[in-house]
């Protein structure tokens, strides 16, 4: 079995494949790829349990592909600066490709472009379409936001005020989910009060919710856009003895989120398929580096469908997701 390296730091999904290159026409083939062996890296944007599932996908691809070795990294502080340090280190180690989830796509464009001159660069989870990345693998986040907006309307048929929570609004996936929610709520009797950010600080994520419950005692709904926001919202609502009185819509499948759905404390969660992010990113990078680009559409965006988890299907989903987590 090929060696699979996990370095526990924090980041979003980035896939870069390739080797050193001397022109702007894209990555050239290095010694290892010319010999048929590829070293691929997957870089996340934080250390959420979400990425544990993505890692299982990369491991499956790693085990299936005899000519591929995968290195998995999580940036501890979830910053663009740490992502750059990781990418520089991976380049120094001679990887052929990197799949990354850019924390701040707009301000990381130059870093991604410089990297793409040397190796194959792929984005996952959060896209950077203005960069020279080869393609994106992940959720259609505008569509996912529309789904979340529809769930908010279901949970609040009489309307009301809602607050949204997310780590960073610089991330494209956050921006697009917010866009989708706003589109879905347009013309409804639901008012978005604001979007509170926490810079991926879990303590701050919860305090943002607690502060909202005090400042806006009539708030009817709370929406978490990133995976850890769901548990943070749930914990703050429980502490305030407002379980059931305030409707919660979340994203992703952290344990406490699924438990909250099962208990009826969370109305629903929109789950992505991070296993497929990892699995497809590695397989497609290999295929791309081997010269076969047929799997990449003209849009350069490979969308993985989302699922809606409510009380009636949470048990079955939890069983399946725990299998992916190796539990």
State where each predicted segment sits.
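Short, low-complexity disordered leader/linker segments with a strong preference
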Residues: 1-39, 113-120, 327
């Amino acid at each position: 079995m090929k060696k699979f390296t996990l370095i526990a730091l924090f980041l979003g999904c980035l896939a870069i494949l390739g080797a050193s290159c001397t022109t702007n026409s894209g990555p050239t083939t290095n010694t290892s790829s010319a010999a048929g062996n590829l070293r691929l890296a997957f870089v996340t944007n934080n250390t959420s349990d979400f990425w544990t599932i993505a890692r299982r996908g990369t491991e499956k691809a790693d085990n299936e592909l005899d000519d591929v070795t995968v290195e998995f990294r999580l940036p501890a502080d979830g910053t663009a600066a740490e992502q750059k340090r990781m990418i520089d280190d991976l380049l120094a180690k001679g990887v052929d490709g990197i799949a990354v989830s850019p924390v701040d796509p707009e301000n990381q464009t130059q870093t991604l472009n410089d990297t793409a001159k040397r190796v194959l660069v792929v984005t996952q989870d959060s896209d950077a379409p203005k960069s020279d990345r080869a393609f994106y693998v992940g959720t259609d986040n505008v569509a996912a936001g529309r789904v979340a907006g529809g769930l908010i309307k279901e949970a609040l048929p009489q309307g009301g005020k809602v607050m949204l929570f997310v780590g960073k609004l610089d991330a494209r996936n956050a921006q697009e989910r917010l866009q989708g929610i706003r589109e879905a709520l347009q013309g409804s009797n639901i008012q978005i009060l604001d979007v509170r950010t926490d810079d991926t600080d879990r303590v701050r994520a919860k305090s943002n919710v607690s502060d909202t419950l005090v400042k806006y005692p009539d708030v009817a709904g709370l929406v978490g856009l990133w995976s850890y926001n769901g548990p943070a919202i749930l914990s703050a609502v429980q502490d305030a003895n407002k379980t059931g009185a305030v409707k919660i819509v979340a994203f992703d499948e952290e344990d406490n989120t699924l438990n909250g759905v099962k208990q009826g404390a969370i109305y629903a969660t929109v789950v992505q398929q991070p296993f497929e992010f990892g699995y497809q990113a590695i397989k497609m990078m290999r295929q791309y580096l081997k010269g076969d680009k047929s799997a990449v559409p003209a849009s350069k965006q490979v969308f993985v469908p989302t699922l809606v988890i409510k009380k009636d299907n949470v048990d079955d989903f939890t069983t399946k997701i725990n299998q992916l987590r190796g539990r």
